[in-house]
Swiss-Prot record:
Gene3D superfamilies: 3.30.1360.40, Ribosome-recycling factor. GO terms for cellular component: cytoplasm. The gene is frr. It holds the Pfam family RRF. It comes from Porphyromonas gingivalis (strain ATCC BAA-308 / W83). One of its GO terms (biological process) is translational termination. Keywords: Cytoplasm, Protein biosynthesis. Its main location: cytoplasm. This is Ribosome-recycling factor. GO terms for molecular function: ribosomal large subunit binding. Belongs to the RRF family. Responsible for the release of ribosomes from messenger RNA at the termination of protein biosynthesis. May increase the efficiency of translation by recycling ribosomes from one round of translation to another. InterPro entries: Ribosome_recyc_fac, Ribosome_recyc_fac_dom, RRF_sf.
Length: 186
């Protein structure tokens, strides 16, 4: 594989790690209501586990409330059960037509737990970025031995890989700092 291809592949892997982290962080509750909080919830619909977003509309009338309106009233109990069984820790209020989720304010202890969780997610993303860098550098070194790539070209490629790595690590740190600030803001 050519050196440019190796760098492009490693960069793509690093980008995927950052995108995945961004997606993970968007599901972390930070004190205000967001329809994304319910993205991972699956509802039993005609015997199949179906994403909640495909069987109901989800709105946020204010910063502390999420309203789930099922497209079929018969699903309201199943949706309520799915929300109760989820790790969100929110008790749904069912009025027969829609479900209201009142988000209680986060306690200091819960905020710290969420920060710890997001820090772990950020660290996992950093590990993925480092692994992509290591794999690329190993492949570059291998190409010097087997393909006859010149040493100076390999050194330049390794330096380029390090720059790309540093850029993605910085992005991860920025995403984490932003989410930490959002979580800790009362």
């Amino acid at each position: 594989m050519e050196i440019k291809e190796l760098i492009a592949k490693a960069t793509a892997n690093m980008e995927k790690a950052v995108e995945y982290l961004d997606e993970q962080l968007s599901h972390v509750r930070a004190g205000k209501a967001s329809p994304k909080l319910l993205d991972g919830i699956m509802v039993m619909y005609y015997g199949n586990a179906t994403p909640l977003t495909q069987v109901a509309s989800i709105n946020t009338p204010d910063a502390k409330t999420i309203v789930v309106t099922p497209w079929e009233r018969s699903l309201i109990k199943d949706i309520e059960k799915a929300i109760m069984d989820s790790p969100l820790g929110i008790t749904p209020e069912n009025n027969g037509e829609l479900i209201r989720l009142g988000l209680p304010p986060l306690t200091e202890e819960r905020r710290r737990q969420l920060v710890k969780q997001t820090k772990g997610d950020a660290e996992d993303a950093k590990v993925s970025v480092r692994n992509a860098r290591r794999d690329a550098i190993d492949a570059i070194k291998k190409s010097v031995k087997t393909d006859g790539t010149p040493e100076d070209v390999a050194k330049d490629a390794e330096a380029e890989m390090q720059k790309v790595h540093d850029r993605y690590i910085k992005k991860i740190d920025e995403l984490f700092a932003e989410k930490e600030k959002e979580i800790m803001t009362v």
